[in-house]
């Protein structure tokens, strides 16, 4: 896994379609779903760690974008 799209596609394979209209909210829900897949032993450690790293980096980028938006 290298991108958020890869993670979305992985979650779709297991019947999880996440879209709330709030990008950060979506990412947090994706993180929760990834954690559940790992706890269920569907994902191995490497996939789990990779997915969490990608999601957390994306959350950080999204928060920075929101702070840089000028009104």
Q: What do the predicted segments below correspond to?
A:
Residues 1-24:
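N-terminal acidic leader/helix
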Residues 17-20, 43, 61-65:
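Intrinsically disordered or highly flexible coil/loop and linker segments, enriched in small
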Residues 29-61:
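Short, charge-rich amphipathic interface segments used for partner binding and complex assembly
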Residues 11, 40-45, 67-70:
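Short, structured secondary-structure boundary patches
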Residues 1-7, 55-71:
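Charged low-complexity stretches with an acidic bias
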